[in-house]
Amino acid sequence: MDSTNTFLKNLDTYDEDALTIAVADYQTSGRGQGVHTWESEPGKNLLFSMMMCPKWVPLRQQFLLSEAGALAVKDALDSYTDGITLKWPNDVYWYDKKISGTLIETAIDSKGIKRCIFGIGIDVNQTEFHSDAPNPVSLAQILGHEVDREEVLQKVIEAFCKYYELLRRADYMDVSGIYHLSLYRRKGYHWYEDKDGKFEGAFVEVEDDGHLILHDKKGVIRSYAFGEIKFIVNS
């Protein structure tokens, strides 16, 4: 199929009270955040999307859904290796290497969130990468052997259901708190680049609407939306 997100988006009927999942061995048009594409060797990685109708999540706090999805991937990967963190806004890292990317698409109507589709790509068994992605890694490369993709999928789904239930109960601080503790570069100063150039910054928080807040070495607070800042790795 072209992409699991598109497949779910085009469904004519679905159960609004259930989690609907689409899985693919290969995607011809797999996407990451913005204009980025996702490289995946057929039959090697885990490519899937989950669709839900969380009408009870406040529109101004919809980034909580991204947090829940990213945490689910982290929990699943934590069972195989250490060093897993969440790189704002939508990547999962093993130390300084990217092992997973996520893409959330939300449909909104006059009442708030109508539907949410969360696309996930996890590098499971691919060992050679040919795109211009600077730092990919797979579970097989980390562990030295292949991993059952179905097992990884089940672990992600189980973890997501746990966090989704917390959101359903309006335990927003629990989800957000765990997300903050799981962030890549949560401590210390690191190199970043924005429209004005490179700078060293330290993490402050991720706001409810998803903005990343940093402060630089002059103490200036900086706020960024998606796509407005680049993480400089190994600088």
Locate the predicted segments by residue.
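General beta-strand structural signal in soluble alpha/beta enzymes
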Residues: A24, I84-W88
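A generic fold-level signal
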Residues: E16-D17, G43, K87, G112, ...
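N-terminal lobe of the biotin/lipoate ligase/transferase fold
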Residues: M1-S79, E146, I221
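Long, positively charged amphipathic alpha-helical accessory segments at protein N-termini or as interdomain linkers
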Residues: K55-R60, L64-I84, W94-S235
